[in-house]
Each structure stands twice: as C-alpha cells, then as structure tokens.
Amino acid sequence: MKPYQPVVASLLNQLRPATILDAPSGSGWLKGLLGFETRMDGLDLFARPPATYGVFRNVDLDLGLPDDLGLYEAIVCCEGIEHFGNPALFFKTAREHLVPGGQLIVTTPNVWYPEARLQFFLRGFFPSFPCLVGRIERGTHMHIMPWSFAHLYLFLRLNGFEKITLHDIDEPKPKRFYERLLGFPQALYCRHKRAKSLTEEERIFWSFAGSAQSIHGRRLVVSAETPNPAVQVTLRDKAAQRP
C-alpha cells in the first residue's frame, strides 16, 4: 500500500460521504479501504471499470469533468493532477460537481523537498518529472506539472475552494540527513512569514507551508471544501445575535 492511500481512506471514513467520484480511479483500490456504504463512481482514461463502482467512464480528465455528471459529496483525485496540462479546468469543474460543503481530496508528488530542489538546481528537472523529448504523446502517463503545497493552494483558492488543509503522511521527514540542513532556511523563512501574518488565512497557510510534510515530504495529500452558504448564513445570524 502506498503511504498516501490510508490517509485518503481515513479522511473519507471520517466524512462518510454518501456519493464519491474517484477521478482518476486507477485500479479502484479506494472502495476497498472504506468502512461504510457509499455510491462510488469512477473516471479514468486507461483503466477498466472496477467491479464495485457504479457509473464508470473512460474520460480524458485534462478536459475537465464531463458536464453531465451529477453532484457529489466528495471528489477524490489521487496521483492525477501531475498529468494534467490544464489543472485549473479540472479544479473548476470539480467545484461545479460538488455539493455546497463538499470535499475535494487531492494527492500528488511534492517537489519542495530539498533533494528535489537540489536535483532541479543541478539538472533543471525535478525527480519524477524528467525531460520527455522523444516520448511526448498526449494521453500517456506523463508527469508534466510539478506541484508544491503553495502551488496547489493557489489553484484551489483561484477556483473558490476553502478550508485548504495539508495532511500528514507516515513517511520519513526528512528522508536523508543532509536534507535537514538544506531545508532549514526554508523552514525559517516560513516561520518568519507566519509570525508576520496579518490575517488568519495567511497564518494558516504559512503553518502548512512550513510544516515537515510540506518541506520534507515526498507526497502531498490536500483536502479542500466548497463554500456552504447555509453555514455562512448561520454564522452571520449567530454573530448578529451577540450582545
């Protein structure tokens, strides 16, 4: 089992959404890790329909989610966005297919860890994101879009998501001793930015950005929520009732 998989399953087992879209679904491993009944649909360019899934389609997710999909309480995108040339379209259409207060869970390789940044400095390419000249073919398993927590946060906020959270993965952080030394300036910078934050959003962002998972982790698991107008109205009403 890959280190990010139990983290994703744990989040869903806590949320217990009645409807889930798994895109890309791959082998359909996710359904087997859930401890509750749910309707799970899947989208994938290559994979065959998993036996336990409901609706399944072969879809190029680089074109976004299909317009005629219904609404879901959760959408999961494991190891997908690094393959997308147009991730903003995916996030936009994911929000359109989530109910108010719905959850998006994303996993992807992280390129902020010190060894990755050192390799980029020496070669110009991140680990797992090699030069693809001579192998460029649309629709194949190419890693074309490197991500850090900061970049993922930006794309999610641009597409209207809230409560963006970076989740811890059980992996060595750092993996190598020298990475602790190379990662220290970045941790110090994030700590300084957190101390200078003017808003709660800034403080939360820099706390996640400066965490061991963000600076030293090899993978990212990030969840985000669509706005829920009903909750916002309730909070405003409660605030108005205070003496």
Please place each PLM-identified region on the residue numbering.
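Conserved class I S-adenosyl-L-methionine
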Residues: 17-26
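A conserved beta-strand element that flanks and buttresses the S-adenosyl-L-methionine
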Residues: 76
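Glycine-rich phosphate-binding loop signature in dinucleotide/nucleotide-binding domains
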Residues: 14-16, 67-70
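Conserved alpha-helix/loop element of class I SAM-dependent methyltransferases that forms part
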Residues: 1-17
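S-adenosyl-L-methionine-dependent methyltransferase catalytic module, highlighting the catalytic core
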Residues: 2, 6, 29, 85-96, ...
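Class I SAM-dependent methyltransferase SAM/SAH-binding core
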Residues: 25-64
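A short His-aromatic
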Residues: 79-83
